[in-house]
């Protein structure tokens, strides 16, 4: 499997007629949408027969994934009008205990990013716009300014806001340890998972961590009755700057002017996150410093901790005299 933080992304490009769309690249906030055959609504997702969010499952716990469309999904009723995704988690098998460990280090990179002009290019373009809109007397920058920025004279170095804000790659660590086994009467599967996903920002202040564990136990009471217990726990930790929407950072970056340095002379990041940008015509844009927005030490902190526990117990009864007929019930 391709290492992913969100299991919903496993379906991308793998199943005919199934489309996925990741609405955000923010660690822990991918919010991937699944659509089957262009339906406008999400399909019904059943994990071991229980309706739940596909993204809440560790990919290492998945045994199989099936996608049902049209008539094949009709058995699940009105809820299956947009298709069905069936996910089965791993279970124990008879035999000696089997211990498995997997570890992945993934470097995520941006597929495309717009190039920004340099300080000297920006000054030349603003001066050209001024001369076209007004006249030479009202030009924001003089010819001397253009020369100074081109030669990077002290005080005219400018700054590369893209490089100061964003790194070329973001690492993601994944670890999973599982133990399975059993005998004729009792079978078990237990797993422990950990994910640490960093963001593209130099501040590394949009981190996401996840701890998860799962235990599936099957007990054979007699030749006709089987009892099972499925337990899972997951903890999601999201650490972000306070009240920062990702879209705001990109908007601020698009208006950040390269004539201004990204740090002060003592190499301290620009301390005031509320300073407005000034357009070439002299009006303020009202946007903030994108680097400050991405830094918890400047913009404050917003931490979110989610704990999710799920449990399912039930039994299956083989009806005597009718081959293959099984009755069952479960509580979750």
Where are the predicted features?
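Short, small/polar-rich motifs associated with maturation and membrane association
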Residues: 1-214, 226-228, 284-285
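Short loop/turn motifs enriched for small/polar and acidic residues
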Residues: 37, 104, 232-236, 330-332
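A surface-exposed, glycine/aromatic-enriched loop/edge motif typical of exported proteins
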Residues: 109-143, 234-283, 332
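Composition- and surface-driven signal marking solvent-exposed, interaction-prone regions
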Residues: 115, 203-206, 230-231, 243-244, ...
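Outer-membrane beta-barrel proteins, especially TonB-dependent receptors
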Residues: 138, 143-145, 152, 209-212, ...
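Outer-membrane beta-barrel transmembrane strands
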Residues: 167-184, 193, 232, 287-332
């Amino acid at each position: 499997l391709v290492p992913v933080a969100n299991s919903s992304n496993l379906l991308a490009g793998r199943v005919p007629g199934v489309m996925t769309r990741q609405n955000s690249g923010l660690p822990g906030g991918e919010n991937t949408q699944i659509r089957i055959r262009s339906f406008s609504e999400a399909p019904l997702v059943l994990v071991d027969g229980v309706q739940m969010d596909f993204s809440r499952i560790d990919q290492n716990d998945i045994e199989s994934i099936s996608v049902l469309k049209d008539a094949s999904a009709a058995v699940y009723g009105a809820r299956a009008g947009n298709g069905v995704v069936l996910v089965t988690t791993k279970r124990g098998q008879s035999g000696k205990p089997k211990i498995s460990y997997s570890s992945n280090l993934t470097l995520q990179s941006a597929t495309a990013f717009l190039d920004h002009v340099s300080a000297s290019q920006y000054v030349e373009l603003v001066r050209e716009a001024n001369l076209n809109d007004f006249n030479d007397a009202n030009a924001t920058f003089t010819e001397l300014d253009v020369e100074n920025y081109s030669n990077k004279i002290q005080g005219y170095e400018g700054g590369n806001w893209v490089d100061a804000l964003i790194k070329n790659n973001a690492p993601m660590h994944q670890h999973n340890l599982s133990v399975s086994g059993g005998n004729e009467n009792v079978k078990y599967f237990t797993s422990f998972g950990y994910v640490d996903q960093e963001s593209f920002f130099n501040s590394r202040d949009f981190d996401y961590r996840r701890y998860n564990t799962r235990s599936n136990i099957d007990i054979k009471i007699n030749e006709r009755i089987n009892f099972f217990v499925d337990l899972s726990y997951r903890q999601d930790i999201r650490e972000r700057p306070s009240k920062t929407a990702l879209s705001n950072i990109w908007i601020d970056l698009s208006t950040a002017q390269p004539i201004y340095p990204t740090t002060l002379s003592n190499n301290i990041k620009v301390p005031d996150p509320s300073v407005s940008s000034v357009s070439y015509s002299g009006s303020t844009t009202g946007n903030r410093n994108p680097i400050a927005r991405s830094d918890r030490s400047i913009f404050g902190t917003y931490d979110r901790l989610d704990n999710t526990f799920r449990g399912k117990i039930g039994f299956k009864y083989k009806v005597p005299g009718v081959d293959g007929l099984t009755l069952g019930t479960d509580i979750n």
